[in-house]
Amino acid sequence: MPLTISLIFAGACALLNLWLAYRCVRIRVNGPGGVGDLGIPVLRARMRAHANFVEYTPFVLILMALLEYAGGSVEVLEGAGIVYFLARVLHAFGIERPRFTMQLIGAVGTWTVLLALAIWAIWTALHDAMLIVR
């Protein structure tokens, strides 16, 4: 059984990860070069956006793949993937703005999707276990 939805969002997230990394590299190449944030506030913000993406994305993608494999609703998984992806884009742009509205929306969107997927995964596992016991 191909995990079509998970594969689509894994690919999309890989591209987003490359874009987030590129935003950091572009500043280094056009600036003094080197490692770390170089004392440049925009670079520091972009590095945090990239690192934050890398911190959350594996959990979301693993949960999506497992839920899809377990027969979870394709429509709900698509919705979760879209919300997560858009939340991460908002977070990436919002983190370098003086007013953190987009960053906050992105963070809340990320947490909401991760929490929903985690609860859904636990419920699915317990529900399936109860069916096996009966």
Residue ranges: model-predicted function:
Residues 9-12, 47-50, 80-83, 106-109, ...:
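Physicochemical signature of membrane-embedded alpha-helices that form the seven-helix bundle of GPCRs
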Residues 63-86:
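Short alpha-helical packing/oligomerization segments
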Residues 119-134:
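Juxtamembrane boundary at the C-terminal end of a transmembrane helix
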Residues 52-64, 114:
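Core segments of transmembrane alpha-helices
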Residues 1-4, 42, 46-52, 72-75, ...:
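Juxtamembrane loop-transmembrane helix junctions in multi-pass integral membrane proteins
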Residues 22-48:
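Cytosolic, membrane-interface loops and tails of multi-pass inner-membrane proteins
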Residues 2-19:
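Alpha-helical transmembrane segments
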Residues 90-116:
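Interfacial loop-to-transmembrane junctions
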